[in-house]
Amino acid sequence: MDLKQYITIVPDFPKPGIMFKDITTLMDNGPAYKYATDQIVQYAREKQIEIVVGPEARGFIIGCPVAYALGVGFAPVRKEGKLPREVVRVEYGLEYGTDVLTMHKDAIKPGQRVLITDDLLATGGTMRATIDLVEQLGGVVAGLAFLIELTELGGRKKLEGYDILTLMQF
């Protein structure tokens, strides 16, 4: 299935010059959303995934149905102050400034095989920070899965050494 036909390109969103890739038109098409999810599930099975991790919010949209299909848990990665129990945290650089991501300290067991999911691989900053959280907890990042990769932004360079699945490239 050609998933690109289900992605809507929105010019000048969220700011002028950006060509936003809207995944909601893929998600609201049942067969396309199922196909995309099934592709990631197949990849995850090959990697013997024990838990799925995803950064908020669109990583949840991808990761939760994958975890469900695999019969494994899902561990959310959230911005600081959003998780109620003890967390590990990582600060990472943005274009202008820094941000912080957190994860419950007991979310990953040492040695557990982890799939990290997100909607989009752009610069790789959020994914690199998520990897750092998983590895702080002793998890083994067995794979990274994205719906979309924006190849011109070079995010793969920050993720060298990790196995990456992308369903579409722009």
From Swiss-Prot:
The keyword RNA-binding does not apply. Pfam families: Pribosyltran. SUPFAM superfamilies: PRTase-like (SSF53271). Keywords: Cytoplasm, Glycosyltransferase, Purine salvage, Transferase. It catalyses: AMP + diphosphate = 5-phospho-alpha-D-ribose 1-diphosphate + adenine. Its main location: cytoplasm. Catalyzes a salvage reaction resulting in the formation of AMP, that is energically less costly than de novo synthesis. This is Adenine phosphoribosyltransferase. The gene is apt.
